[in-house]
Amino acid sequence: MAAPTLLTYGTGNVDETLTLAMTNMIPGIKDNIFNENTALGWFYSTGKEEKKGGASLSHGVQYAKSTSGGSYSRYGQMITTPQDNKTRDQWPWKQYYWNVSIDGFTERIAGGGDNAIEDALQEKRDEAEMTMKDRLEIDIFKSSPATDDLRSLPNLVLGSGTEGQINGTNNSWWQSNVLTAGSWATGVGRTQLTNACNTASKRNPTGPVECLMSDQTSVEAYESTLVAQYRYTTNKADIGLTKLLFKEIPWLWSVQANSGVIYGLHSKAIKFYVHSGTDFKFTGFYPANAAGQDAKVGQILLAAALTTPIRRKLFKTTANAA
């Protein structure tokens, strides 16, 4: 890395005012780059579950009803045929890292003593953690995850394909409900989302999904159908809504979400597992002596898995538009 860029002093750049008075260096680094990671936040607050170990993760899955029973009278024959209606899925852990490095000059010399404005080491860690969260949000909505990436919503919430080592193309009980929507202005978007919500409500676990997750455009398409009614009922000249619900289900949106897609999620049907000992764990700094550098390096580590034990409870509507 190049030498630090210093301010240019001298008579052409610094006058009497700057010679006699210091610039007021306001503490804090103002974020002009990172986005709100809505989906990751929901998974951490609602769908997260910590686990300690295991080479992989697995749920017991019920895939059929028992038919070994019925009515009878007196000496009537009872069905005693044994049945096997259960199996298991399997989900491998996915590991993430982000490097945190600092050179000796910044840590000991420039950033030491009374002239330090910020804690350089902590700022480096905070930046790496926020970057890692941005990466996870992207991966949650990635259409084609890499082998080492988390499984993503576009693949988990699908009416086909193998997830958790169970074939959803051949097994209808391992398929999410996927509907093609359309314009909200003409009512197609609302009709399809209503149908998807009602269908999910009758599937175990009983009740509606807990969250709708979409892109900004889909949220605004729905919101535009509500504004006129909102103004009429409140007598306020307001053209927006601060909290969005659909059939009393909270509706969130992410900057990384798939265009025109609305997901229906339930915390018992989609699980975000995090290894309790590797949940944004910082390894600590160690010398970068191998490269002959006056520097320290460390990593922030995460081991996690985005899974679905009840794929049929999840849904999505696609092609949503204003």
Residue ranges: model-predicted function:
Residues 2-322:
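Flexible, glycine/threonine- and acidic-rich loop/arm segments that mediate assembly and lattice contacts
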